[in-house]
Amino acid sequence: MTASASSFSSSQGVQQPSIYSFSQITRSLFLSNGVAANDKLLLSSNRITAIVNASVEVVNVFFEGIQYIKVPVTDARDSRLYDFFDPIADLIHTIDMRQGRTLLHCMAGVSRSASLCLAYLMKYHSMSLLDAHTWTKSRRPIIRPNNGFWEQLINYEFKLFNNNTVRMINSPVGNIPDIYEKDLRMMISM
């Protein structure tokens, strides 16, 4: 991974990895589910200054002093999240440069928000898609972008680096990212 260690340090008081509430990805970027995104105590204790809601089904409670951004995308294979990769990555970066903190969330903090996080790490931390996924999964083990988002992330990685570190492969359950091939083989052999 090419990002500096300081940009990934945890703040004091944040335990990692956190599956059900906030997961700190970088010093200024967090992932969560929709319930945690509406928890005033969690937001204030983690000094969140911006919330990106990557869902159509979660309604945010608006708290003073927090900027809210809506990315109205469903968690479906044919949903177009790619168009939001650059604008949301740029926003997260701008907030970080101003010493702010961003919370990305969707319904469960598994697919849509995780995909936006991976795009940000590729663009602003020069991480390959594979490294971005490995890092983010180490911080939030439940991430699992849907296959349509994987295809879009693979295209985005190619746009950024003219190279791919993850590819879609054919499997008994359809096309999947090659990083899931080992897990699938283990499941099938059981």
Swiss-Prot record:
It is a peripheral membrane protein. GO terms for biological process: flagellated sperm motility; peptidyl-tyrosine dephosphorylation. It is found in: Cytoplasm; Nucleus; Mitochondrion inner membrane; Cytoplasm, Cytoskeleton, Flagellum axoneme. One of its GO terms (molecular function) is protein tyrosine phosphatase activity. Residues 43-128 are annotated as: Sufficient for mitochondrial localization. Expressed in testis. It catalyses: O-phospho-L-tyrosyl-[protein] + H2O = L-tyrosyl-[protein] + phosphate; O-phospho-L-seryl-[protein] + H2O = L-seryl-[protein] + phosphate; O-phospho-L-threonyl-[protein] + H2O = L-threonyl-[protein] + phosphate. One of its GO terms (cellular component) is axonemal A tubule inner sheath. Keywords: Cell projection, Cilium, Cytoplasm, Cytoskeleton, Flagellum, Hydrolase, Membrane, Mitochondrion, Mitochondrion inner membrane, Nucleus, Protein phosphatase. Protein phosphatase component of the sperm flagellar doublet microtubules. May act as a regulator of sperm motility by mediating dephosphorylation of sperm doublet microtubule proteins. Can dephosphorylate single and diphosphorylated synthetic MAPK peptides, with preference for the phosphotyrosine and diphosphorylated forms over phosphothreonine. Microtubule inner protein component of sperm flagellar doublet microtubules. Belongs to the protein-tyrosine phosphatase family. Non-receptor class dual specificity subfamily. This is Dual specificity protein phosphatase 21. It comes from Homo sapiens (Human).
